[in-house]
Each structure stands twice: as structure tokens, then as C-alpha cells.
Amino acid sequence: MLSGGTATLAPAAPRAVARATAARVLGNDALESPLRPHGPAARRRRLLRGVLGSAVPVAALVVAAALDRLPWWPAVTAAVVLLPLGLALGVDRYRRLGHALVEGHLVVRWGTVSGRHAALQTTGIIGWNLQQTWFQRRAGLVTLVATTAAGGQSLEVLDVPAEVAVALADAATPGLLTPFLAA
């Protein structure tokens, strides 16, 4: 996920056009490379968030029906439609989540339905931040943030296992983390 000022290479376009544009700009096919998935904890997080997002309106309709404010059919209809939809969106979000280190670029993918790709030249990385929410800490996940010298821009690798995040940062910027890593 990008933060700070960002530049879009092309407006919404067919995948082939977007990939060809990226290959011309990057000078390689980094976006074509297979990405490393973020594991079962990230998958659980994506599925849980998808289902909980659709469970809230279903629960509200169930409560309204239980209090005789509404008939039962809206709650049942919402459950039949929204819960599988939330699950499908969670699966899609996990499928699109990944990262790779390819030919001097950190490549990250995230998003739902349309998905987003970003590639950052590793020579532009000046530092790393590991961020964790309370929920990520319990799942053993972190958000790895690559800080760049380009103003306030950064690139986030969402919900990656902590040990993978440290290894990725060390591989992307050899020597930068060495003083901070335990022998």
C-alpha cells in the first residue's frame, strides 16, 4: 500500500496495457514475477475481516426481527447474500496480497476486486519501519514500511509474518539492518 504522494502510471486500463506500461517504466518485468503469499495468519485476518464486515448488518437485522421491528425475511436474505459475499471478498483480498524482491525492485500487491500493484526501486529505500496493531501482534504479523527519500512517500507490505519482514528488509537493502540484527 502506498502512502504519501504517489504517481499513477496509467489510468484504469486492461491488465496487458498496465503491465506493458510498467515494464517500459521499470525496465524489466518485475510485475510479472510470482509473488510470495503472506501465509495462513494473513489469510485468517482477511477472511475474518470480510465476514465480520458483512455480519454486522446481518446481526442488526436479526436483532430488529427478534424485537418484532421487522419480519425475519430481511435478516435471512441478508445472511444468505452478505455472508458469502464477505467471505468471497476476504478470499479475493488474500489472493491479491503478496510481495517479491525482483531485479532491484520491491514489488507489492494488495487490494480487493481490482487490486493494486506497486514497485519500488530498492536503491531508493532509506529506512524501514515495522508497525503492528494489537490484532497483528496476536497473529504474529507486521506491516513492513519501506521509507524512501522521495518526500513523504513509503510503500507498505501488509500483514507479513514478522520474521519474513525482517528477512525481506535485509535482502532489499543489504547492510542497512546488519547493526540491528542479533548475531
Residue ranges and their predicted role:
Residues 1-183:
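N-terminal basic, Ser/Thr-rich segments that initiate or prime the first beta/alpha elements at protein or domain
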